[in-house]
Amino acid sequence: MKKLYFAVGSQDLYGDECLRQVAEDSRQMAEFLNEKLKDIAEVELVPTIINSESCIKTMRQASCDDECVGVITWMHTFSPAKMWIKGLQELRKPLLHLHTQANEKLPYDSIDMDFMNLNQSAHGDREYGFIVARLGIPHEVVAGYYKHDDVVAKIRQFASVAKAISYSKSLKVASFGNNMREVAVTDGDRVESQIKYGWECNYFALGDLVDIINAVTEAEIDAKMKEYTDKYTMKTDRIDSVREQAKYEIGLEKFLAANGIGAFADTFQDLHGLKQLPGIAAQNLMAKGIGFGPEGDYKISALSAVLMKMSEGKEGATGFIEDYTYDLTQGQELELASHMLEVPPAFAATKPEIDVLPLGIGGKEDPARLIFDGVTGDGIQVTMVDMGDHFRLICADIELV
């Protein structure tokens, strides 16, 4: 289980009794957050940060712990921020500044300076926030009482993103063939992608994949066909074409698993040794969280894998689609999105049907694919392009109709 470190700031100026209370309040907060985030990551309380040495130790530990995907920080008392500098400079994991308080309400009838020194987040978090900004460290800020639903929702969002970033750092992408000939936007700098995002994108000979596909047994295909008929409606009588796709899915899954690969890209111009363009095979693998990019677009395959990891446990659907053509009726403008085959069943509003239909591109046999009515509702389209000196992430709010 991946985990988030919960690091609480204080100092030894206020004495042992104050620090004991800080530790107890921190324990209760960590237990509460752990319960609220347990489906995403475990929240692990680390010793209270009271000086530069303890900060350095904690941040180094977080950076070196493969199971730690991020750090949540909060200042219970005032915590002089110079003691955070060296530790934060060591941190290599996503950082959340939780600007909150152990108590929701003030005890107006009994409040005194002891209480105010102990519960000094309004002061301490500003000091801490200043030094994080001064250091130029990218981070998220969530403000509000930690038990409130809106605050919990934002912390959960950070946890999901941190988990996806961790996944991104170890993601391997397979390119079968190269970029579609003469196409610009699908291309990109693979070296820079690995530097920026951790994506290890390498070319693999299609022949190596074809060898694995051709070694798939009839018994394995029978089992995959049983899976298909359990999940989908068989609309075609061209069963041999469907069995061919089943063989592709089995072979692809074996190849990806053997090489620790979480995303792949192919192009219809380089499918030597395959009778069909992968249809159901690609659609089903996306349904299992494997990223896919057509026309050799390794960026989209990697990005979709990361977004699917980020969306785990959430309602809705995540998958690949491509912009195609417009309906420009005034006041009713629409865009029809599609692709040759590989729209994933995550977007299905109806039970998908398996059919075999002609495909007028690629020069291959008619492929088997899943066909379904699409879902409706609000969504976000996301893409990534390489602008030469930087990557650009483009997002658009959309409505699926």
Task: Kindly give the residue locations of the regions a language model identified.
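Metallocofactor- and cofactor-centric catalytic cores in central/energy metabolism, strongly enriched
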Residues: M1-A263
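Anaerobic metallocofactor- and corrinoid-dependent redox/one-carbon enzyme cores
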Residues: H76, K93, H99, L106-A122, ...
